[in-house]
Amino acid sequence: MINKGKGWRLATVAAALMMAGSAWATEYSASFKNADIEEFINTVGKNLSKTIIIEPSVRGKINVRSYDLLNEEQYYQFFLSVLDVYGFAVVPMDNGVLKVVRSKDAKTSAIPVVDETNPGIGDEMVTRVVPVRNVSVRELAPLLRQLNDNAGGGNVVHYDPSNVLLITGRAAVVNRLVEVVRRVDKAGDQEVDIIKLKYASAGEMVRLVTNLNKDGNSQGGNTSLLLAPKVVADERTNSVVVSGEPKARARIIQMVRQLDRDLQSQGNTRVFYLKYGKAKDMVEVLKGVSSSIEADKKGGGTATTAGGGASIGGGKLAISADETTNALVITAQPDVMAELEQVVAKLDIRRAQVLVEAIIVEIADGDGLNLGVQWANTNGGGTQFTNAGPGIGSVAIAAKDYKDNGTTTGLAKLAENFNGMAAGFYQGNWAMLVTALSTNTKSDILSTPSIVTMDNKEASFNVGQEVPVQTGTQNSTSGDTTFSTIERKTVGTKLVVTPQINEGDSVLLTIEQEVSSVGKQATGTDGLGPTFDTRTVKNAVLVKSGETVVLGGLMDEQTKEEVSKVPLLGDIPVLGYLFRSTSNNTSKRNLMVFIRPTILRDANVYSGISSNKYTLFRAQQLDAVAQEGYATSPDRQVLPEYGQDVTMSPEAQKQIELMKTHQQATADGVQPFVQGNK
């Protein structure tokens, strides 16, 4: 016997009776009172001739006592049990050395893997691989963990691909868990039934039945996961496959039969009255949704187009639009109807609008000076310049025609196409024509077109006039009448814009802006007609709501000087002016185009913008009234304040009152007396 306490130790490890012969084995009796655990381990190692390594974390005191004599195997199991009680375990190494560690660390150490032939005994740490054939290890593992010594180093892991369990722990506990697995791993009565559906969708039916079974088990159902029926959809044949024990299968089959009914007689048509969207356009969108539904429910049929009829899951799907009430009429099975209803609800929303304001600023300034002197001789010869007015030859012919025939047609034609001053002198055979013209043009154009449109909707604004332009002439068959062909060209302010609202209150604007006007009228007898000044901007810009940005601009300055003269004579100082014609023109033009979008997401913002525009226009009317002195005149029409009814003239109000009086008297059977003005 070995004893330790109070500074003395008594160890007796010899056999109580030593007898010759191999029939007698060594026996041990051990008792430790308040002994250090390291001393206990060292004593056992010495008695069993084992080399034992102690982990530094192994500390503490033990109190154990054995009243029986133990053989070597029993003595070793006694050693393992004592360590187990105090939270430690022994891990045997390949070289025969034993390692003492904490129990929770033993499962990650090199503990032996045992099998059916050598399962291990007692409290030695082992790992065992247990194959399972009839039960899912995923469902079985949580149950075994509750039976294992998890705090003492036990562990249960499942491996789904091979459907095996890896159990780690004390050999006695592991063997007990293996026995539990053997008793549970029994093949059940798993027959299969196939139900062919006529009306419902197999996928939706399985989803519904699975949810019902799940809810029943979660609310206290006594059907185990092993005995719970399995329901699978075969969408290729639109069938439901049910497996499980007979009673569970019968209940599922009855449920499926009751749900697989024709719902047309139960009313599967609904009318959706749209608030914001257009029913006709919505139908086109729902066609694409129907194609997606067809793909999801391929086992049940095909989708339909608007007004058509095809089946999905054995039911009919039809979508049409009633434009008079702006409504959608949809016929579909309940599950399909629910999906389409969600799509309609998300599409039928109030779309944001965009107020687009453009500012076109153009400032032009031009100066011109034309001077010319022309000579002619009745015997032939002369000088003629047309850059400063009519030629002297045309004037001479028109004057001779007037002198000989008294006809003024030629002179009228020349006067019609001439600007400025013209003076003629003649003496003997010589005639002189002096022309002079000075021009000074200034223009300041400010255009502010604005338009409100829906998001992703093109809108156009056009204010202008149609100007006739002669494109050709044609003589009649008799030759005495000339017909002119006219084409009208629109000039003014044109704005075409398509806004797209992006995230962060930014707007992508596709803009086409044009400002055109009638320019200078062509002079002379060529009949080419007027010229047109056109300013066009066409681009796409990204602008934040409420910000003003420039779209483009032009700064143009032109200087033109033209001199026509008689060689040599025109170069003589001072006298040379009598033999030449000069034309000087200078023009400057500055043009800038700005744009500002404003997002209108709700009615309040829209109303505020409208109020500002309305109030500005009314203020301009009031200013005009004050300037004209009509502030107290009842005949002057002024817009009322924003939100109030339009004020009618006193004469119109009088006529309405007379009409009401007449209607009331007619209803009472009395002929009203109305005195007219005399």
UniProtKB/Swiss-Prot annotation:
Segments of this protein annotated with the region N2: 189-264
Protein location: Cell outer membrane
Disulfide bond residue pairs: none
Name of the protein in question: Secretin ExeD
Region (S domain) residue spans: 604-678
Quaternary structure, from the entry: Forms a cylindrical channel with 15 subunits.
Organism superkingdom: Bacteria
One GO CC term on file: cell outer membrane
Secretin: annotated segments: 353-602
